Amino acid sequence: MDNNQKKFSSYVFLSSFGRNLIEDFIPIILYKCGFSLIEVIFYYLLVNIFSLLLSYPCVWISNKYSNKVLGIIGIISFAILQILLNFIYKSNLFIIMLSFMYALYRRGYWLSRRFYNLRVIRKQNISSTYSLISIINHLGVIFSTYIGSLLLDFLTIKILTIISIVLFLVSLIPLYLLNFEHKEKSCKLEPFKTFKLIPKSNIFLFGAYELINVIKFLFTMYLFIYVKDNFQTIGILNLITNLSTIIFAYLYGKKINKEKNFLYLSVFFVVIVYILKLNSTSHLLILASFLEGIFNKMYELSIQKNFYLLSKNFDYQNYNLVYEVTQNVFRTIIVAILYFFVNDLKFMIIIVLFFISFSMVFKFDSLLLKND
């Protein structure tokens, strides 16, 4: 790894540890504070709507000023989000404020992180570098959710939010130490032009992959409501999932370059594993969580290899914007369908898996890829 990759990896580790102490538990915190399941789904729908609306303004800010400025906006929004979680009250106004700050934090964080990901990963070793950064990310996540669950079960949310904010702030140090030979340059934002050039099968595959985040959100609620109503259960299962993710990324990450069937196999097994997890208890649930980490990472590496490879044909800002809009459109449409037409949590998960399974019908179009 070169110096920038090391600095970026430090940023990824610290920020991942800090935000995952509490982020996965937000829907459960709302549920425990008196919000109904459908109200929590409404909150998640608003998050995705705001995320979609904020996509262009956030990329404009990063293009006009810098992605580091956008990262600061993400940090400030994260801090406000944590403060709001300490003063929860049951009202639509609170849900709107919380969902907006969460969306702004996520856009500020992920747009800047993805931009620097695109810059530090070279075309010659995409899979190996991404696998290593991914391992570092999951090292930050692996214990953070469990530690967060312990703090929520035995202490107070105030202590957890303070720790989370401090770690997130510290993560800015390596981010600001990034130093590239070619400085960030503003460009003309032409997302429609970029969208037209990207093969539509790729657009669908990128969007469908992001539905995994919807599955994770729903499963967090499902496990708490129907399996065991404490934070530690979620923390332990997440620890198991992230452990298997690290093992797979370390052992098989480089093989993604050579294996063309990884995408189809990963989508198939992801759907099977989540169906297994949906119908599991006790030891089977632990096994399903372990397999979830393996096949989710297999799916992620298959998608991200093509995402980064294709990015070398475009300006990063426009490419980042198109991907951002794509993922938010897919999530918003699916969550809206769930909110307006489905009442059963288990059926919600099955519907999302159904849409993800369509990825097996498509394949990545590599006609645009440069051979340099």
Question: Where on the chain are the PLM-derived regions?
Answer:
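Helix-loop boundary and gating motifs at the non-cytosolic
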Residues: 1-50, 196-238
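Hydrophobic core of transmembrane alpha-helices in multi-pass small-molecule transporters
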Residues: 13, 92-109, 284-299
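Transmembrane alpha-helices of Major Facilitator/SLC transporters
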Residues: 49-57, 140-143, 236-256
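Symmetry-related core transmembrane helices of the 12-TM Major Facilitator Superfamily/SLC fold
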Residues: 159-177, 347-364
